[in-house]
C-alpha cells in the first residue's frame, strides 16, 4: 500500500511538472515579425483554445498539488466518501485536460494548414518558433493526460478495493 501511495505522489508530481512546463510554453510564447512593413505579433491570446488550455492547466495543476498536500497530511481513511470524491475528480481532470488539449491541437492544426473559407493564413510559414513551441506544449499536455489516465486507474483501485467482491456495494469489513 505504501508503494502505491508513493507511486501516486510521483505521478501527481510528474503531472504537475508536465502541465506547468506546458503552461509556461503556452503563456510565455509570442513572436513578432515584420510582414509587408507591418510588425505582426502572434501570441496564445489569438487562439481561444490555447487560452482555455492555459486556464485548464492552471486549475488541474492546483488540484494535483492540493491532492498531494491532502495525501501528505491525511491519515488512512476507512470510509469511501473521500475516495469516491478523489476518484471522480481525477476522472474529471483527466477528461478535461484531454478535451482541452484536443481542442487546442485542432485549433493549432487550423493555424498550420490555414483555411481559405475562413480566410485564415498559414501562420507557421511566418511564425515558426511560435508553432514549434505550441506543438511542444500540446505534446506535453497529451503526456500529462496519459499520466492522468494512469492516475485515475490507481484512484479507482484505491476505491474499489474497499468493496466486497461477493456483495454489491458492501464493504469488505462488513461481510
Swiss-Prot record:
The chain crosses the membrane at residues 8-28, 52-72, 92-112, 137-157. Residues 29-51, 113-136 are extracellular. It is found in: Cell membrane. Signal peptide: none annotated. Pfam families: CASP_dom. GO terms for cellular component: plasma membrane. It comes from the Eukaryota. Keywords: Cell membrane, Membrane, Transmembrane, Transmembrane helix. Belongs to the Casparian strip membrane proteins (CASP) family. Homodimer and heterodimers. This is CASP-like protein 2C1. It comes from Arabidopsis lyrata subsp. lyrata.
Amino acid at each position: 500500500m505504501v508503494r502505491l501511495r508513493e507511486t501516486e505522489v510521483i505521478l501527481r508530481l510528474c503531472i504537475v511538472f508536465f502541465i506547468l512546463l506546458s503552461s509556461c510554453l503556452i503563456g510565455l510564447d509570442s513572436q513578432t515579425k515584420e510582414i509587408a512593413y507591418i510588425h505582426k505579433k502572434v501570441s496564445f491570446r489569438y487562439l481561444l483554445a490555447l487560452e482555455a488550455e492555459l486556464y485548464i492547466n492552471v486549475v488541474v495543476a492546483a488540484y494535483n498539488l492540493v491532492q498531494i498536500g491532502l495525501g501528505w497530511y491525511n491519515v488512512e481513511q476507512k470510509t469511501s466518501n473521500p475516495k469516491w470524491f478523489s476518484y471522480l475528480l481525477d476522472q474529471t481532470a483527466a477528461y478535461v485536460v484531454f478535451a482541452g488539449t484536443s481542442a487546442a491541437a485542432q485549433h493549432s492544426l487550423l493555424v498550420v494548414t490555414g483555411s481559405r473559407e475562413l480566410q485564415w493564413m498559414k501562420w507557421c510559414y511566418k511564425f515558426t518558433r511560435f508553432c514549434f513551441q505550441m506543438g511542444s506544449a500540446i505534446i506535453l499536455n497529451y503526456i500529462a493526460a496519459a499520466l492522468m489516465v494512469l492516475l485515475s486507474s490507481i484512484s479507482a483501485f484505491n476505491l474499489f478495493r474497499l468493496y466486497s467482491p461477493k456483495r454489491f456495494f458492501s464493504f469488505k469489513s462488513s461481510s
